[in-house]
Amino acid sequence: MKYFVVLVVLALILAISVGPSDAVFIDILDKVENAIHNAAQVGIGFAKPFEKLINPK
């Protein structure tokens, strides 16, 4: 989650500093951020069944 917050902050700083003319960089950074977020969600989805096997309630 920390990496996601760092990427959001960096995207905001970059968006403010470059302005609307260089929005391509923001688009690329946004796509990378979304890919990392989706990968983290998939990883959590894979980990939950193993967690339930190890720690049954």
Curated annotation (Swiss-Prot):
Compartments, record wording: Secreted
GO cellular component, one term: extracellular space
Effect noted on mutating residue 44 to V: In strain: B316
Known tissue expression: Ejaculatory duct of adult males.
Annotated phenotype, changing residue 48 to N: In strain: Z22
InterPro entries listed in its UniProt record: Cecropin
Pfam families: Cecropin (PF00272)
Induction comment from the UniProt entry of this chain: In response to mating.
UniProt KW keywords: Antibiotic, Antimicrobial, Immunity, Innate immunity, Secreted, Signal
Domain of life: Eukaryota
GO terms classed as biological process: defense response to Gram-positive bacterium; innate immune response; male-specific antibacterial humoral response; response to bacterium; sexual reproduction
Signal sequence, start to end: 1-23
Protein family (similarity comment): Belongs to the andropin family.
Function comment: Male-specific peptide with moderate activity against Gram-positive bacteria.
Protein name listed in UniProt: Andropin
Organism encoding this protein: Drosophila melanogaster
